[in-house]
Amino acid sequence: MSSASSEPGNGDASQQPLLGLDTVIQRLEDTILSPTASREDRALTVRGEGRQASPTPVPTRIREIVAGSLSEEPPQAGVQEPTATVARVQEENELLQEELTRLGDLLAQASAERDELASRCRVVSEQLQARLETTEAQLRRSELEHSVDLEEALGRLEAAEERSTGLCQVNALLREQLEHMKKANDALGRELAGMTGSVQRLQGELELRRWAQRQTRSGGLGQPRDLLLLWRQAVVLGTDLAELRVATERGLADLQADTARTARRLHTACLNLDSNLRLSASSTASTLGQQLRDKAGEMLQLQGRWDAEKVALQARLSEQTLLVEKLTEQNEQKAKTIAALRTDLQNLVAQEDARCLELAGSSITELGEPRRPLRSPQRATSPHQGASPPHICSPATLDPALQAMRAAIERRWRREQELCLQLKSSQALVASLQEQLSESRRELWAAQKLQQERAREQAREREALRGQLEAQRLEVQQCRASCKLLGREKAALEMVVEELKGKADAADAEKQGLEAEAAELQRSLLLQAERREELALRRERSCRALETSQGRLQQLEEKVSGLREELASVREALSTAQLQRDVVESEREGLRSALARAECSNADLELLVRRLKSEGVEQRDSLAAMAALMEGLAQDKSALNHLALQLEQERDQLREQRKTLEQERARAGEQLAQAEQQLALERAERRGLQQACGRLEQRQEQLEGQAALLGREKAQLQEQVGQVTCQKQALEEQLAQSLQDQEAQMGTLQQALQGKDALSEERAQLLAKQEALERQGRLAAEEAADLRVERDSLESSLLEAQQLATKLQEQLEEEARSAGLARQALQVEMEQLQSDWEVQEMKLRQDTVRLQRQVAQQEREAQRALESQALAHREALAQLQREKETLSLTLAEEKEVARCQLEQEKELVTKSAAEREALKGEIQSLKQERDESLLQLEHKMQQALSLKETERSLLSEELSRARRTLERVQQEAQSQQEQAQATISATTEELKALQAQFEDAITAHQRETTALRESLQDLAAERGDVEREAERLRAQLTVAQEGLAALRQELQGVEESREGLHREAQEARRALSDEAREKDVLLLFNSELRATICRAEQEKASFKRSKEEKEQKLLILEEAQAALQQEASALRAHLWELEQAGGDARQELRELHRQVRTLKAENQRRSGEAHELQAQCSQEVLELRRQAAKAEAKHEGARKEVLGLQRKLAEVEAAGEAHGQRLQEHLRESRGAEQTLRAELHSVTRKLQEASGVADALQARLDQACHRIHSLEQELAQAEGARQDAEAQLGRLCSTLRRGLGLQRQSPWASPEQPGSPTKGSDSSQALPGQQGTSPPARPHSPLRWPSPTPGGRSSELMDVATVQDILRDFVQKLREAQRERDDSRIQMATLSSRLSEAECRCARAQSRVGQLQKALAEAEEGQRRVEGALSSARAARALQKEALRRLELEHLASVRAAGQEKRRLQEQLETLRQALEESRRHSQGLAKQGKLLEEQLTNLEHRCQKAEVSLEPLRQMEQETLKREEDVARLGAEKEQLDQSLNSLHQEVDGALRQNQQLQAQMTEMEQAHTQRLQDLTAQHQRDLATEAERLHGARPQATQALESQEWTHQQQVKVLEEQVASLKEQLDQEVQWRQQAHLGQAFQTGHAQRD
């Protein structure tokens, strides 16, 4: 039983260990490899027992260990001894320890390799970090140095700009002072011209007074006192003029000396600056060329080195990137092996634990404790429990073997934990190394990118600097060539100037001869004037008319000469403008060619820049080399920037010098041309004077024959005037265009004052001589202008008093405008300086921004270079992983190569630093020289400025004195004008009575006069739009003439006002004489100032003065252009007026003929007086004429071209101006009539207002009368009541009387009653006070008190009868008074109604008059249309004449254009000379040949002009046609007579209206005295209404007539309503009176019946 039972037990036991073995093996594999281990983990190999055992996989090794342990055991394990098991366990433990040691060795090897990789990575990262830090430090240093250099450059630029701005300000101040002086001179010239005109007018007035005094002496009414006063005034004026002349000459001499000193100082300063600039430019150009050559060599050497270093560094970087990649791969593999080993260890530990547990269990079972169950194998094999082995069994129950086993397991477990910790730390190290590698790669990549970008930017900058230096070299060469050309041109100009000197000497001789001839001519003219005065006293009115026409012809001839001179000046301006335009075009072409060359060079430079950029991108890959090169390049860049700035400044200076030289050459050519033209003009003027003298002698004999031919040639002259105006317009347009071109050129010329070379002294001498010639020409022109002004002054008349006042105001306004313009010019220049400073600041800011951008771009390029280097470094790390063994050798070699390169770069840096220091020293020396020169210049300029300021202060003092005198003159003129206005207001107050009958007519005239006033204001305000305003004035004149024709019959009474106007004119003459004295003083002062200015101008020999004289010429041309425009507009206006006068105003001109004759007589008297004054002033004029003769001798040759056309234009314009003067006289007369009409208008408007006030007063009176009627009616009602009461009382009295009589005579039986019942008495006594209270006005008239009915006797009754009689008498008186008042009120109503009817009649007449005026306006508009048709036909005829003149002008223009084309061709040749620098000799010869050709062409042109003069001689016969204008004058006289008749009739009507108004005023005063208290409110209200209506009428004048008509209609309606009310009131009064009478009769009848009963 026991055996049987034991066998199954054994079988179960044997099966259980087999199953447990498989599970234990599986669990060991799971614990070592983990259940989810991959195939690769399970394929891990482990060496078997012994050193030479082959590696086997971990699962197989586990099975081998388990199989070996099982094979060593005997088949009966139950009986084995514990010692054998312990030995096996120890062996297995030893095997496991060996495996653990082997794994530890592997781990140590892996950790060693990992440490080695980590150390290598650290070394590489440290190297990269060191390189990055070095590159960053180098970049920072380069940036700091660059910023420092930029700051230094900016500081130098600012200093240079400040100096340049200082010089510019000095130059601007000098220019401003010169411009102010010029403006002051011009203003003084204008004032002198105005003063001379006023002096001449005053001389004419003095001559008229002398003639009048002579007549009065001949008639026995001489006034010696007036003559003595006049002579004393003339002597005072002469002394004042002499003093003013001396003072002005003295002041101008001082000013001239000061200006000459300043000019010399400026000239020397400019010369010093020019020499310094030239020296600095030459030295800097040479040094820059050498530096550029050195830099080019260094750059080529550096480029080669950079190429070699780039290749080596690229190879190293690729190797290092490979090494890095290999290391990363190895690290990954090692991490994998470590993870596999870790799993193996875990599996082995688990297997050992399981085996130990099984052995412990088996040993325990063998020791005889089978009942004690084992712990579940799951708990033993769980890894969590494996971490806590002491919990398996208590230590008390285990034997020492088990304890040893447990200790071994614990040791393995601890070792395993240590290994796990080491693995974790190694993985963390690997991750950190990978992150460091990635960061180092990124940093390397960024550093490579930055270095590449910086290298590219530096290459670009280097190329740009090279291009700039090359461009500057070219510009320097061009400037040198231009200087050479200018020197040659200067020599040619000197030759031309010498020739001109000879011509000028000849012209001076001719001028002296002409002066003598002019003096003789003046003497002959004076003798002729005296003869004319004698003949004027003897001849009749026809001879006087002929003399006036002769004077006008002389004036026309003078104007023709003035126009000729103006045309010549205009042509000179045109020629100068063409020359300047050609010069500008040549300069533009040169600039275009230079720009084309610059563009080509820029294209080449761009190609070079691109190539160098591509090379530079390749040259910047090494970090160490880049650091040193960056330093060198930054320093080189700063040095090159400084050099570039200096070269740019020098280039600008050279350009400015070239421009100034070219402009001076052009100006010299222009001045030569102008001098030639002036010579020709002077010759032509001399010939013109000779011919004028001949014509004067001929005209004196042919005046009567020419008077008949003037009318025929009128139309031809008008057409010719139209053609002349067209030509003038064309010339004006050309002038405007030339002026614009000249202004544009002046802007460029103003910038040329900074650079002057050594040629300026000689050129200044030549210019001084030319300026002397030009001044002589200008003096001659001014003297001729003065002569013209003196001749034109004979045209002044009595009606020019207001014009003189307005002229004075205009002169003052012009002075204020000139001062305002000067202020504006100063403000503009200040603004320009500010704008220039702002532009410079903007440029500096842009430069700084550009530099910042460049720095940023360099930084970006450096970052890109670093990034590219980082990429390359990654590749190098990958290569390092592949080539681990050769890395140390290559690194050593590379270090050696890098050291060599660094040493070489350091040597280069030292060399470049030495060169840079040398360049800096040179630059500093140059800067010091330049600063010293600039300081000297600034000092000199400050001295010149101080002198100029003193001069300016003196001038300002003189100007202030002149202004004070002008203000004093203006105040006196204003006071005189106020006196004249007071006299005029006194006369106008006498004419205020004209308002009653001419309301509508004067409103129409008021509209016309307001339109004229507005047009005149527009003329004064808008001088540029003269033609349209002239047309408007013509239309208004036609309207005024038509209005005068319509009012011809009504204006017969104007003769009386005319006498008043004559008195006012005499007073105005006196005021004008006073003003003339003051103006003479100012004229003398201005003439002396002008003389001193001319002397000052003669001594100014600088370039600035020539420029100012050109500006003066431009101003003269502008003034001439404005004068031409004004004369053209005046001629157009005169033509229109002539056509209108020829169409519609013939009858009026016939009427005005008589007045024209009288005016002719007055003009003759004035001419006589003017000749007397002219004889006194002849001595002063002789000197001026001598100078004029000299100028004419100089201008004689040039005037041959234009003489024929000028004569023709002069004749045409003279005829037009003569007729225009006549029309101006007619205009003046019409203006005088307009003034009278305005006075009448004002008076009529006042009368209208008075009439409206009268109407309102009448209406108020009517209202008062109505109120009075109502009060009378009330009084009548009260009187009726009182009468009824009285009648009742009378009835009662009668009854009492009858009763009393009856008692005495008939009825003794009557009761002795009282006379009235007490009841009645009480009633009556009670009623009467009530009545009295209701009618207080009746109380004074009824003083009775009714007696009480006391019983009495006969005496009381008699007393009652007496009182009744008194009461009746009072009542009758009151009734009579009421009737009288009623009759008076009726009479007043009748008078008021009659006055209202008269006012209505007047309104009706005014309305009819308005209708007549409207008809007249319509007829005037029709006449205007007819005139427009006639004008269109006249324009067509004038167009034909224009074509003839145009053909002649075209021939002249063709010659001028040929000359201009030849000049242009010469300028083109000059440009070719500029471009061909090497062929200077041939070009100089060509210039000489071209000068000869020019002289030949000028001679040809003179011959052509002479031919043109011969062809234009028939046109001179046009002068004979001016005599036809006398017929127009006769017609004007007839029309004036008609106007006088109409004025007489108008005066008569005005007198009648005045008488009527006086009567009305007397009646109104009588009525107003009765009703003043009640009418005050109504009149005040009505006056306010009228004031508002008047303001509204002034605000809306076209609606004035409608408003007046509506007001009149409302007045009529009101009057009608009042009349109707009065009539109704009358009817009511009559009805009430009748009713009351009937009622009274009825009551009386009833009382009678009652008493009878």
From Swiss-Prot:
Transmembrane segments: none annotated. Residues 86-145, 310-351, 423-1215, 1361-1570 form a coiled coil. Disulfide bonds: none annotated. It comes from the Eukaryota. Keywords: Coiled coil. One of its GO terms (cellular component) is centriole. Belongs to the rootletin family. This is Ciliary rootlet coiled-coil protein 2. It comes from Homo sapiens (Human). The lineage of its organism: Eukaryota, Metazoa, Chordata, Craniata, Vertebrata. The gene is CROCC2.
